[in-house]
Amino acid sequence: MTTKVAIIGSGNIGTDLMFKIQRLSQTLEVAALVGIDPESDGLQRAGRLGIPITADGVAGLLDIPGFDQISIVFDATSARAHVANAAALEPFGKQLVDLTPAAIGPYVVPAVNLEENLAARNVNMVTCGGQATIPMVAAVSHVAPVAYAEIVASIASRSAGPGTRANIDEFTETTSKAIEVVGGAHRGKAIIVLNPADPPLIMRDTILCLIGDADHDAIRDSVHRRVAEVSEYVPGYRLKQDVQITTVTDDVPLSTLGRVSQ
């Protein structure tokens, strides 16, 4: 018995999610793909797969036959659109998974805090950069207090559709906040780079944590354990290089970090 889901947003993220569920999931079934452009590539491809589609947004989803059988709705639109979508769907008691930076519900990073948010009706998946990096910040903060954490997410420009590009500011704000709330850093900062390299590169992220005295081996062990946990649900997730730890003595000025973390 599969759980029926709907996906709002027929752009890159929504379409990719649709194919991942169709090809890989044994527990979920895509019962609808929702967009606003009847000529969008995502809706066309879903139609060819026999998946019910609508180009009338969330209003069209409410009218799709079998809507009452849908249990989970993934929203892959934009931060602003999700606010309206969540309000429209609230009376129907659906589980909402927010793939935008709107963050109406709690931030959820599965390897860190999934269990404590299972009862939430609207969960926010932060951002792609947040999902990749926050587990590492949390791994460090599990061993030692993190005064400041900074992440740089570099993704292929081709993978960023109009929705992602329109949400760059929200991306940095939401990810920065989640670094603090979920990652455990006192202050967080996020930077996104859309790399136009061709052929497109695989997403890479860099994480910097500023901590006090700590057991270096314990930090490395914590990071490696968390990498193993994430790789269980994100195939291919790995450290590109081993954990680097640099001791900063009192006579070395932290000119940049000092200004940011004050």
From Swiss-Prot:
It catalyses: acetaldehyde + NAD(+) + CoA = acetyl-CoA + NADH + H(+). It comes from the Bacteria. NAD(+) binds at residues 10-13, 159-167. This is Acetaldehyde dehydrogenase 7. Its EC number is 1.2.1.10. It comes from Rhodococcus jostii (strain RHA1). Pfam families: AcetDehyd-dimer, Semialdhyde_dh. Belongs to the acetaldehyde dehydrogenase family. GO terms for biological process: catabolic process.
